[in-house]
């Protein structure tokens, strides 16, 4: 190897490269040219956002079971301030029009004189913190209507000069308030574990919810699902649609007889949705398809005065990917449907059965799953798990059909922070065994489950004596 020639070659190459580098720098650098700083905008800003302090949600549904409801409003910052900084929160009545327009809702403003903020709404974020909270109290009033949703838009105001508010969404959080004082037969305490029940309505009357009563008069099932309507393809319209079989449609058409008596006692009634052996499916809608289908679900809930929906991804065929309403089956598509459903009906429950592709994606468009999934229930013999910022309070810890609500199971639910237990397809013909499997109710609620005395036959609102009239 000739070291002399290699060294000479390297030196020549370095001279050429340095010349090229200096020429490039000279070409790029223009002294006195204004620099576009847009790429750096925001990096020094301290952006604020508003949340409900208890739930950390932007949109919080509040049910008034007593004369007052207490929570906190939290202002968070994107970074720790150099010195203490402050802002105020207040009711922004004008924002409600914007909110209603965005969600196609018609919520009325909650009476402002029934809402108070501690410390005149002032929040102070200390130099070693990134958030602050202020107490908020919502009082009940005599003029409130039952079964109506009111809105309280809360906004940041009078912020210090070092606080930036990026947009209207960051500036606001909203409380959707329902007066439940006259519909409290399911209310067993704010932190009580709740019951979630599927009714096979092809065979069983949902009024049988009323058979399950504690000795203290409370009903154990807080939410029931009409199982199930279907998602099907409408060939004339060229899009997915809701399809109700005659049994489901009968209950919807006669909801004042079979559903509203439950709702007036505090039971939430949901429409169950299930695939039905064609090209559509709950986890295979395109973004636009999900938005359109969610709007139809919202229309059903409004027309028949229902409390929300349960989605179950089963029994769908592979989609036609040439159809603009459909896409490849995925958990992302299922999450999009849940997200769009919550946008279309923010005061209703959006719940999922964690099966197939229905559950698993934690964010849609940067919005956490805790904002658009209210409850997740598991398959038989398993427990649901939270995703994103969800907690076990939004999850069922057991699923009927594979598990019983025994005293030890009830203690496990409470000790592990689960918010729900799930039951499936009760029939009066099986009440003896069903009630024996619910003896953990006393552990949960401090009151034993009464033996059944009444039941309801299909499509008949008459209470019959159990077991004599079976």
Language model regions located:
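Bacterial N-terminal signal peptides that target proteins for export
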Residues: 1-11
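Hydrophobic helical h-region of N-terminal Sec-dependent signal peptides
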Residues: 11-19
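C-terminal motif of bacterial Sec signal peptides marking the signal peptidase cleavage site
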Residues: 20-24
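Secreted glycan hydrolases and related glycan-binding modules that recognize and/or cleave
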Residues: 26-86, 91-114, 118, 124-137, ...
